[in-house]
């Protein structure tokens, strides 16, 4: 869904909200699912989960030797309900900085997430929406669902 300078994405996961929140905020979990399409790894995943704390992700694809990095600063953290952080890619493929807001809502045995990205301009939003990021996001969300299932199985044992 697109509105002016926003992009929004909604997902649902079959896991309690706290576990989903942890999967978005703990480096040892994030690096297991936030990888994009097959062939990418995440050699750098640093998260200082506090207001004013920074995060840094670097993805690498061995063939053809591509690397992509991004980072930002946490502006608001309400565990396990809401995260607000800035976002800026190293290669600045869209102008300026974006502001990401992720909301986690528990609905029975499902957690619904809404990620809203506010770009500095409609141009930046348009560049991001044409980037093909949906493919990488879909692959990541599939991995996240698998990870959450594994975590719930381990917790039940």
PLM segments and residue spans:
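Hydrophobic ligand-binding cavity/cleft-lining segments
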Residues: 1-40
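Short, surface-exposed coil-to-beta transition loops
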Residues: 8, 42, 67-71, 95-100
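A short, structured loop/turn motif at beta-sheet edges
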Residues: 17-18, 48-50, 75-82, 103-112
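Hydrophobic pocket/interface hotspot
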Residues: 20-21, 30, 55-57, 74, ...
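Beta-strand/loop substructures that line and gate deep hydrophobic ligand-binding cavities in soluble
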Residues: 84-138
